[in-house]
């Protein structure tokens, strides 16, 4: 595992750093995507990134990217990490949805959507999770049925939940059940849908952090053309894996959120630094942060060799959520009576730790629960036997389900 940049990578890093220094404001904590000013700021920033060639570094040049390497993409993410950039609004679309479209869609679809998404003109969301499915992506009940009018269109009905950014999105990719007579992994089909269709109702979920990043989405008699299908009929699981693989490859910066700001705050508080218990905690968090950094280095090494990162990356998320909980909890305690402040308008520095603290429990669910990730580590890293599956060869319609 090589921790150092090659000369070419070092030159690219310097180029990225110079551009960010000139264009991006410094920050300590992420922006709240639910705030009214987030959308216009995000679109301006995305357009600037696209114009400079940093919006989608690994995309082919024919589609507006640099044709760069995954390592260059990671380098940019590392360098952008310490800056206050409203990029999260586009991360799902550009990191997961559009790469799926580029992999399986026809040329007309790619030509229509790739450019506008890259420039921030259109926003995408991912409609996967359902209320009854839990962490089982394949337990999809949302139905897509061929219209009986001979048009070849599909009619979609169902419900999705925990859809990030749906309230801002123009389009989404949706996984549906098209054949309930076969086992659950074989009867799914993916489509893209217009989120402004009258049959699409988005209900933001109010979080205890005060924001509403996640949404319930109700789909009622939404008609889609067969040309909106992504992949073959019944190949939805295979296409979903393309999306999930790209999610894993959407690598963020090496430093966990909040660490530089917390360290600076602790150094600026002499009485805090006299606290032996706090110094011990700082040492523990440093070790965790370094462990996460070296895990990312393993990912970068794999990418530089043209390999796909392995399931070891699941370890990083488990460690990260524990780390963020401990870090934000200590930050709130250090603020004493000011720790109850949750309005950035009153004090951005005081409100940020509480936002992280109350938002962290949701991170344990997003992108794979702790339990799912531990199963992945047990089965794919440690080689332990997998859970017994009794539904492997059972038609989806015959599977037992709750009332």
Model segments located where?
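A short, Trp-centered hydrophobic/proline-enriched beta-strand micro-motif
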Residues: 120-128
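Internal helix-loop-helix
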Residues: 50-121, 165-171, 247, 289, ...
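A structural signal for short hydrophobic beta-strand segments in well-ordered beta-sheet cores
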Residues: 142-146
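Alpha-helix capping/hinge segments and adjacent helical runs
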Residues: 22, 50, 66, 247, ...
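Amphipathic, small/basic residue-rich leader segments at the start of a protein or domain
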Residues: 1-91, 112, 116, 251-252, ...
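Glycine-rich beta->alpha junctions and the first turn(s) of the following alpha-helix
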Residues: 200-295, 363, 399-403
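A short core secondary-structure module
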Residues: 141, 152-203
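Short, charged, amphipathic alpha-helical segments
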Residues: 279-283, 311-318
